[in-house]
């Protein structure tokens, strides 16, 4: 599953906007207030239609506060009025077929339902039926969004913090809330660690997740012999490695710097959700799971050296995922091809390639 384009009408700062996406990577750039987060939020609502249509999951729709406002000069006063309908129309590829669906809100008292998104909600219903029948051929797409508050919001209590049952759709719990859900993720790590101990053998999808974390930590630090383990005494992940002085280090992820912690939490959240959604893929779960991951300010807390490689690392670890990200960082922009960059300016998409220099 991936998004091809969005058409926004009366959505926040845009009266009308069309954005096209690369099927592997789109980097959205622009000055403050240009609408980068708005485009990501619209894409989240569009992609999240799939999970919104599933039983027991939150409906992420358009809210009345998302309406675009117009000002009317009435002489002695300026009248500010919300504009309706608010519409997000998406074109995407789902299971190899192009479909179009719309999310809308027709009035301030209206409800952002799913009636106009039937082409995608039918897919969600089909997925649910196939899950109920235990269909091993079903590969569920990851759909996840990470906002600018992801580092500090991740420890908050959330309503979806328990696995009621071993249900594949648990991989979608809180996935569009904008922050890595550490409580839910740690419960999964705890559960997998216990299962490996009881079985006295590795669980392939769990090994794949740990290996991804070890690979990215080694990549951004240059440290060797990196291992990631769940620590049952602290309820945290420990990173074990040899530093550049060959000193053996063991440190909880929670005590790492913001940049390390943000990167590891992001990749861990994506990876463990894939393992929940598609456990039948075993050690291929990270390389075979498709889907859409949206990241606001992908450079958040990262050293410029890491900014140059964060997108490369993400696409190598998750080769079938479409990443739609925003950034201010020149290092991130210069690390990608021009066709992957969308520049927002003057309430629209700016076509001048030199604008990204």
Which functions belong to the PLM regions below?
Residues 1-184, 201-204, 215-218, 319, ...:
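P-loop NTPase switch/coupling surface
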Residues 91, 147, 229, 240, ...:
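Residues in well-ordered beta-strands of folded domains
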Residues 158, 170-288:
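Extended helical coiled-coil dimerization/tether regions that scaffold
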Residues 143-147, 229, 291-297:
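Extended hydrophobic secondary-structure segments that form protein cores and membrane-embedded regions
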Residues 1-57, 235-357:
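Switch/communication elements of ASCE P-loop NTPase nucleotide-binding domains
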């Amino acid at each position: 599953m991936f998004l091809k384009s969005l058409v926004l009408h009366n959505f926040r700062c845009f009266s009308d906007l069309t954005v096209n996406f690369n099927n592997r990577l789109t980097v959205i750039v622009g000055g403050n207030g240009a609408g980068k987060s708005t485009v990501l939020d619209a894409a989240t609502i569009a992609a999240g239609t799939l999970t919104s249509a599933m039983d027991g999951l939150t409906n992420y729709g358009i809210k009345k506060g998302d309406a675009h406002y117009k000002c009317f000069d009435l002489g002695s006063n300026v009248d500010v009025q919300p504009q309706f309908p608010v519409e997000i129309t998406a074109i995407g590829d789902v299971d190899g077929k192009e479909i179009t669906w719309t999310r809308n809100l027709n009035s301030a008292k209206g409800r952002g339902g799913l009636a106009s998104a039937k082409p995608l909600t039918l897919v969600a219903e089909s997925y649910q039926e196939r899950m109920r029948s235990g269909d091993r051929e079903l590969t569920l797409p990851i759909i996840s969004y990470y906002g600018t508050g992801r580092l500090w919001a991740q420890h908050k209590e959330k309503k979806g913090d328990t696995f009621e049952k071993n249900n594949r759709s648990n991989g979608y719990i809180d996935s569009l809330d904008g922050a890595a859900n550490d409580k839910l993720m740690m419960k999964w790590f705890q559960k997998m660690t216990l299962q490996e101990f009881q079985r006295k053998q590795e669980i392939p999808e769990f090994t794949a997740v740990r290996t991804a974390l070890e690979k990215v930590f080694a990549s951004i630090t240059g440290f060797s012999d990196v291992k990631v383990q769940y620590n049952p005494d602290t309820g945290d992940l420990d990173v074990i490695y040899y530093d550049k002085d060959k000193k053996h280090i063991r440190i909880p992820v929670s005590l790492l710097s913001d940049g390390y912690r943000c990167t590891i939490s992001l990749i861990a959240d994506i990876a463990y959700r894939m393992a929940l959604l598609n456990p039948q893929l075993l050690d291929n779960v990270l390389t075979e799971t498709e889907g859409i991951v949206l990241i606001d300010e992908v450079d958040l807390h990262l050293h410029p050296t890491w900014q140059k490689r964060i997108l490369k690392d993400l696409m190598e670890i998750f080769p079938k995922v479409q990443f739609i990200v925003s950034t201010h960082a020149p290092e991130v922009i210069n690390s990608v091809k021009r066709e992957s960059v969308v520049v927002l300016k003057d309430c629209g998409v700016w076509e001048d390639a030199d604008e990204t220099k």
